Curated annotation (Swiss-Prot):
ATP binds at residues 169-176. InterPro entries: ATP_synth_asu-like_sf (IPR023366), ATP_synth_asu_C (IPR000793), ATP_synth_asu_C_sf (IPR038376), ATP_synth_F1_a_nt-bd_dom (IPR033732), ATP_synth_F1_asu (IPR005294), ATPase_a/bsu_AS (IPR020003), ATPase_F1/V1/A1_a/bsu_N (IPR004100), ATPase_F1/V1/A1_a/bsu_N_sf (IPR036121). GO terms for molecular function: ADP binding; ATP binding; proton-transporting ATP synthase activity, rotational mechanism. Keywords: ATP synthesis, ATP-binding, Cell inner membrane, Cell membrane, CF(1), Hydrogen ion transport, Ion transport, Membrane, Nucleotide-binding, Translocase, Transport. This is ATP synthase subunit alpha. Produces ATP from ADP in the presence of a proton gradient across the membrane. The alpha chain is a regulatory subunit. It is an enzyme of class 7 (translocase). The lineage of its organism: Bacteria, Pseudomonadati, Pseudomonadota, Alphaproteobacteria, Hyphomicrobiales. The record marks 371 as: Required for activity. Belongs to the ATPase alpha/beta chains family. Its main location: membrane.
Length: 510
């Protein structure tokens, strides 16, 4: 075989010409020690706080403690495969998550990876999970209602778009039920072809809950047709503490996409006490100094920087909004514990749920006396303002009188009348789960209550009266509901028609 020297030199020259000098430079460290979801890493001198790092087996982590001789890394996953002496790579990116409409209808983990078996996420954009909240200039005061569909809340403790309203109570008092009903109530707003300014997308963040509970929640959303406008972020009880810590920030970033693009979203953190516990665990393992109840000193900042990201933006910034409904679980109704007082002071009001009321059959078990909305009637329609102003005062008087009435048996007629009305209004505010009411339906029901049409009825008949009145108004007298819905007001003309209908119905009902 004849090989010519010229050919060989040509081939060699060709090979040398195509030889690239691009060498990939990555900063690499070594694991000094690992355990309890925390790794101490040596050699990552230029790593940023909050930067994502990658271990040899592909597990991700986040650099939290930057010390002189090592870096404390929290691990987003199992630490079993990570051994002392293994290498750790910098990724040069701060922890981020996919955002956009491609996430709607999906269930993701705390880093935005799908866990529902429906294939990869169709999202083109990624955003950092921990960003600064909007400043003072882009904001606008809350001025439009975020209807929950629950009479007790929409009438007495109204929530507006862009507000932060805390749902607080002991375990098993119906906190998640309120959140679920709120999501289901947005279905009429999110119909196909509705204007973006009307729609309200929902993000539900489950922190430290049982997997079965989250699966049940998702199943209900799917059955009721609410999953298509919702995103579920799940960091369950079996997930490592860093995942439970980061999940609310991930969900918030997904909600912010809608807020910043002139749309509206509501985010439910269920619940933040479990996030605080996860953060306490991480902080203590990172050897940060403990404070009250062994929580780290910056646990207030943890929640305030998260909840400040919920805002109503002004027209120059797209007029979008992000409403936050954080949930806090108390122990034995103790609202004065560390985390509950922190979150109460950060939010714009709280819905306080009580075990005693729950077991008395008053559900939703809202304690109307202790619950407040610091946004108030600016988050209500004119129609609701007209009827709800009375019910607040009457219930306050009723609570005061009921306390005294226990001692005296001979009550004068006016006190007796007040107690009767209060008992019926309390009955009127009860509502079964999965049956949210539209704003105009709530208005007519409360109108009947505050104007004394229930006073002659036995308390047990109040529910039947309400159902009958609503079916009459949805059927023959649908014009009244339409008038209230379109004008968002209870005009004198509509009020007169409504009065006539309620009066004639009350006569036939009795």
């Amino acid at each position: 075989m004849d090989i010519r020297a010229a050919e060989i030199s040509a081939i060699l020259k060709d090979q040398i010409k195509n030889f690239g000098q691009e060498a990939e430079v990555t900063e690499v460290g070594q694991v000094l020690s690992v355990g309890d979801g925390i790794a101490r890493v040596y050699g990552l001198d230029n790593v940023q706080a909050g930067e994502m790092v990658e271990f040899e087996n592909g597990t991700r982590g986040m650099a939290l403690n930057l010390e002189t001789d090592n870096v404390g890394v929290v691990i987003f996953g199992a630490d079993r495969e990570i051994k002392e002496g293994q290498t750790v790579k910098r990724t040069r990116s701060i922890v981020d998550t996919p955002v956009g409409k491609g996430l709607l209808g999906r269930v993701v983990d705390a880093l935005g990876n799908p866990i529902d078996g429906k294939g990869p996420i169709q999202a083109t954009e990624r955003k950092r999970v921990d960003v600064k909240a909007p400043g003072i200039i882009p904001r606008k005061s809350v001025n439009e209602p975020m209807a929950t569909g629950l009479k007790a809340i929409d009438a007495l403790i109204p929530v507006g778009r862009g507000q932060r309203e805390l749902i607080i109570g002991d375990r098993q008092t119906g906190k998640t039920a309120i959140a679920l009903d709120t999501i289901l109530n947005q279905k009429p707003l999110n119909v196909e072809g509705a204007p973006e300014g009307q729609k309200l997308y929902c993000v539900y963040v489950a922190v430290g809950q049982k997997r079965s509970t989250v699966a049940q929640f998702v199943k209900v959303l799917e059955e009721q047709g609410a999953l298509e406008y919702s995103i579920v972020v799940a960091a369950t009880a079996s997930d490592p503490a860093p995942m439970q810590y980061i999940a609310p920030f991930t969900g918030c970033t997904m909600g912010e996409y809608f807020r910043d693009n002139g749309m509206h979203a509501v985010i439910i953190y269920d619940d933040l006490s479990k996030q605080a516990v996860a953060y306490r665990q991480m902080s203590l393992l990172l050897r940060r100094p403990p404070g009250r109840e062994a929580y780290p000193g910056d646990v207030f900042y943890l929640h305030s920087r998260l909840l400040e990201r919920a805002a109503k933006l002004n027209d120059d910034h797209g007029a979008g909004s992000l409403t936050a409904l954080p949930v806090i679980e108390t122990q034995a109704n103790d609202v004065s514990a560390y985390i509950p007082t922190n979150v109460i002071s950060i939010t714009d009001g709280q819905i306080f749920l009580e075990t005693d009321l729950f077991f008395q059959g008053i559900r939703p078990a809202v304690n109307v006396g202790l619950s407040v909305s610091r946004v108030g009637s600016s988050a209500q329609t004119k129609a609701m303002k007209k009827v709800a102003g009375k019910i607040k005062g009457e219930l306050a008087q009723y609570r005061e009188m009921a306390a005294f009435a226990q001692f005296g048996s001979d009550l004068d007629a006016s006190t007796q009348r007040l107690l009767n009305r209060g008992a019926r209004l309390t009955e009127l505010l009860k509502q079964p789960q999965f049956s949210p009411l539209k704003m105009e339906e709530q208005v007519v029901v409360i109108y009947a209550g505050v104007n004394g049409y229930l006073d002659a009825l036995p308390v047990a008949k109040v529910r039947a009266f309400e159902d009958g009145l609503l079916s009459l108004l949805r059927g023959k007298e649908v014009g009244i509901l339409d008038a209230i819905r379109t004008s968002r007001d209870l005009s004198d003309d509509t009020a007169a028609k409504l009065k006539a209908v309620v009066e004639s119905y009350a006569k036939t009902f009795a």
